[in-house]
């Protein structure tokens, strides 16, 4: 555009604090990322054209992407539906579409050739979820508004032949399952990418814009994040206090200890065994009516069906920020590469799967746990 280059972090933090200056512009603004052998141009509509009351508009570009994404073959000999998606992505290369979350983040459409992504396919086949996904189609990179993504570091968005959406993060070398359909991807954005919930605390304005929880002590909590004794002390000091957890659907969390878990379907014997393994009850979630535990390393778990633990977050901070999202989409989200013996190296968040509920490696259940308890209380 005008030759001004801005880093992603400075753009967001400045705009989030209300100090970003918008110049008058024509319908489209663009930024260009120049490399020795490639010129990538991004086209950005004005914010008023992209958002309505803070939420992304379902624009004609989004509708076109949905139609190409969900295209069905009317005749047996017609080309695979992925061809329509590839054609659409090439035709709209450079267009920036806002995501539902995080704020002011979006996907810039384009194929691997457009961005110069040259990773070998073996890079992606190291992940069990992508091995099972069948053919994969690259649709773009994630960037902040008015910033052209860097192909070496930006999250890559891939769609499988079944319509499932994945994000590969080169910096983490992890794959996240974003949605099992176009609708899930549009509604959730990158909410399944757990690393966003462990970003450093900035200030109350940014915290509220990103996570929408009501816990007032996030700054102090961030200072003692890896000090389990102090974390438990904070939970005890807030015993009986109710807060709204971040994310959707809305859930409340009540700080408390042993007595809080008495109404859980787990008997005292199960909870006693967990305490011997250094799991401590720190509170209670509603409306799912589940006891919440902290392990010896500060990880946060929830007890399901009286016998099964599911890890919700690596830290108390991440749990408060992401909230009840796992109960809306009960499945495994995060995948690390397979090691040399073809076993998963690490399962950091939402990693528990149960054979009785497994549809595939990453689909835990086809329905929301919240739906199952909405009319009956505790399951």
Swiss-Prot record:
Pfam families: US22. InterPro entries: US22-like. Belongs to the herpesviridae US22 family. This is Uncharacterized protein UL28. It comes from Human cytomegalovirus (strain AD169). The gene is UL28.
């Amino acid at each position: 555009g005008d030759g001004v280059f801005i880093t992603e972090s400075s753009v967001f933090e400045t705009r989030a604090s209300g100090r970003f200056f918008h110049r008058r512009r024509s319908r489209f603004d663009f930024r260009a990322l120049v490399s020795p052998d490639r010129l990538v141009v991004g086209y950005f509509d004005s914010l008023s054209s992209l958002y309505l009351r803070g939420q992304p508009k379902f624009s004609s570009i989004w509708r076109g992407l949905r139609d190409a994404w969900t295209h069905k073959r009317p005749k047996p000999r017609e080309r695979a539906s992925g061809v329509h998606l590839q054609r659409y992505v090439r035709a709209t290369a450079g267009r920036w579409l806002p995501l539902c979350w995080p704020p002011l983040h979006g996907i810039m459409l384009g194929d691997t050739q457009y961005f110069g992504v040259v990773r070998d396919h073996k890079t992606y086949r190291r992940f069990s979820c992508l091995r099972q996904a069948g053919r994969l189609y690259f649709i773009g990179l994630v960037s902040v508004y008015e910033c052209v993504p860097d192909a070496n570091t930006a999250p890559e968005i891939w769609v499988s032949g079944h319509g499932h959406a994945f994000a590969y993060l080169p910096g983490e070398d992890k794959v996240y399952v974003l949605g099992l359909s176009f609708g899930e991807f549009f509604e959730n954005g990158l909410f399944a990418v757990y690393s966003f919930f462990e970003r450093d605390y900035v200030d109350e304005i940014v915290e509220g814009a990103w996570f929408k929880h009501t816990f007032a002590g996030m700054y102090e909590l961030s200072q003692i994040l890896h000090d389990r004794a102090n974390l438990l002390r904070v939970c005890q000091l807030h015993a009986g206090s109710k807060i709204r957890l971040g994310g959707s659907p809305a859930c409340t969390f009540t700080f408390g200890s042993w007595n809080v878990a008495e109404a859980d379907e787990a008997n005292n014997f199960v909870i006693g065994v967990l305490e011997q393994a250094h799991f401590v009850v720190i509170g209670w979630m509603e409306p799912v009516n589940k006891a919440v535990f902290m392990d010896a390393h500060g990880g946060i778990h929830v007890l399901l069906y009286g016998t099964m633990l599911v890890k919700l977050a690596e830290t108390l901070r991440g749990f408060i920020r992401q909230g009840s999202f796992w109960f809306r989409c009960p499945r495994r989200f995060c995948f690390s590469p397979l090691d040399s013996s073809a076993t998963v190296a690490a399962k950091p968040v939402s990693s528990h799967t149960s054979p009785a509920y497994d549809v595939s490696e990453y689909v835990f259940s086809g329905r929301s746990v919240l739906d199952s308890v909405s009319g009956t209380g505790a399951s």
